[in-house]
Amino acid sequence: MSPEKAFTQQQKDAMVAAIKQAEKDTSGEIRVHIENRSKIDVLDRAADVFAHLNLHKTAQRNGVLIYVALLDHKSAILGDAGINAKVPADFWDSIMKNMVAKFKEGKITEGICEAVITAGEQLKVYFPYQTDDVNELPDEISFQ
């Protein structure tokens, strides 16, 4: 089964709504990428996806990727240089722990949505919305 078919339309809509809500008050960009398997180390794969989705090309280097390999039960959260320079060293790990705890309860969508919202809260602190802000990347989930 393709990873996209693992989610109902309502679940996909909830994740997109979380992205839109998280980005509403920040210039930061958040993307969610879901696939069945990572054929290489999960962090290496997440870095490849990060580059493929152009998260490294935001003006303030404040892109965030939430990566999930469903069948491998692996995930990663990567921030670009701009946001990584601002958040505490263990910030992404704490979001990951909360997300994985939800996954273990079978609440994949809820875990992803909460991770997106939490990342957005930090982006808002360090990269608040500017009146001339443009949405640099699409507010959507990518599947592979």
Feature-to-residue mapping (PLM):
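A structural boundary signal for the start of the first folded domain, especially the loop/turn
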Residues: 1-63, 68-144
